[in-house]
Amino acid sequence: MSEIWEDAIKSNAWPFVEAKKILDSLNGKVPEKNYVLFETGYGPSGLPHIGTFGENARMVMVQKAFEQLSDISTKLICFSDDMDGLRKVPSNIPNPEMVAGYMDMPLTSIPDPFGECESYGHYMNAKLRSFLDKFGFEYEFYSSTNCYKAGMFDEMLIRVLEKYDEIMELMLPTFREERKATYSPFMPICPKTGKVLQVPIEKWDAKAGTVRYKDEAGNYVEVPVTGGHCKLQWKPDFGMRWAALKVDYEMYGKDHLANARLYSEICRILGGKPPVQLCYELFLDENGEKISKSKGNSISVDDWLKYAPVESMALFMYQNPTRAKRLFFDVIPKNVDEYITFNQKYHLEEDRAKRFANPVYHIHHGNVPKIETFGITYALLLNLTSVCNPSDKSVLWGFISKYEPKATPKTSPYLDHLAEFAIRYYNDFIKAYKSYLAPSEKHKVILQDILDMLSSISDQTEAEAIQKAIYDIGMKAGYENLRDYFKDLYQILLGQSEGPRLGTFIKLYGIKETMKLVEGKLYTR
């Protein structure tokens, strides 16, 4: 048993919970293949999106947790369903008219609309691999097309023929009457057109390894099920793959949950053992709709990394995988600041179980870097950017250096990156939407009180003392709810309904600069 076992289990961190499930499923035995196989899947009909990254990031968290608890070797494969027939043309690709002429063709048989690779499927696979490589994932890439054509699934495909009636008994009750009449687990690849055919199978022969169907002209066509001449419908394909590859762990989105029983049962029918499974909730866009590769209605990995470090994206993936979460640009600043908080807590924590419970342990697979931001958050930088409208990060560093003389781009490279990210985020998402509140007579009294307070303190006054003074002014102003007081101040001074702790902000921005800001709002008609 691993030396860290007790603390890992005590932490109740979900990657360790999943890792223990895998160990329990092995009953203390090393698999015949001598390693534990983790599998992620990718449907390359559209460009890879952040959900694709998320599945792989989460999978690696479980894989690394398993390696902490056991000395059994592991392997991660990323499986691309690139032999699927094209059912719909994505809205976010070039040359859609050209692609539309290849409906029902395997994705690896469609010309690349981007003009870069040998096929549409190859282009999408390359995109997936490039960003998995970029983030250091260690995986083996499996192409459905290659697996079928190379004969990797041949033994299982013959077994599907042998178990044909049993599989049909399992599948048919899940369909409507009209689909029952035409369904078969096999989809022949038409020898003439190359299309993936969804046609009734008239005859199947396990000994010969063939199926027979009628083509469009009404002629009988007999094809082998092996060697890439047929592929399985996606539900039987899922279970067959588990059995063929001996997958030990798989995670999938909630859209697969209703069919998970079928995948597992088909795997058993074919003589395999279903893997331990985790069903994660899907990401939603800002309208509460499921994000989609073909719609392109999500944040891409590149989008996120334009405005924030990769660790913040990994944190978003780690948090509550079984709970649906909205994924849009507003979540980025929150995740950056939560990452900073978790990082600081991790390095202050001496209890190992609590360290294991900290998301950053799993984000960095136990090798957590120590970052220094001198108490400056991403949200604070966004608000600083909002008032000084800098052309580049050197302007922000002018304020940061006065706030904390020890802070420089060299002593805090993380903070330096955040300054750059904050300017980009402000310019793209905040600047155009600022809406200032014109101060009422009541507000002007408050602003004058703030001015008087600021003129009575020095640059050495602590942020907490400034915060308390601001708070006291709000209490004196007679607000029933001080949230309304701060909201009014944010709208008057920053043009937004939410903002930072004003004591910290004023300390960072500077007393004199804040007085000028307040005077501008107080005396401008």
Curated annotation (Swiss-Prot):
A motif ('HIGH' region) lies at residues 44-52. InterPro entries: aa-tRNA-synth_I_codon-bd_sub2 (IPR020751), aa-tRNA-synth_I_CS (IPR001412), aa_tRNA-synth_I_cd-bd_sf (IPR008925), Lys-tRNA-ligase (IPR002904), Rossmann-like_a/b/a_fold (IPR014729). Pfam families: tRNA-synt_1f (PF01921). ATP binds at K293. Keywords: Aminoacyl-tRNA synthetase, ATP-binding, Cytoplasm, Ligase, Nucleotide-binding, Protein biosynthesis. A motif ('KMSKS' region) lies at residues 290-294. Its EC number is 6.1.1.6. SUPFAM superfamilies: An anticodon-binding domain of class I aminoacyl-tRNA synthetases, Nucleotidylyl transferase. One of its GO terms (molecular function) is ATP binding. The keyword Ligase applies. It is found in: Cytoplasm. This is Lysine--tRNA ligase. It comes from Rickettsia felis (strain ATCC VR-1525 / URRWXCal2) (Rickettsia azadi).
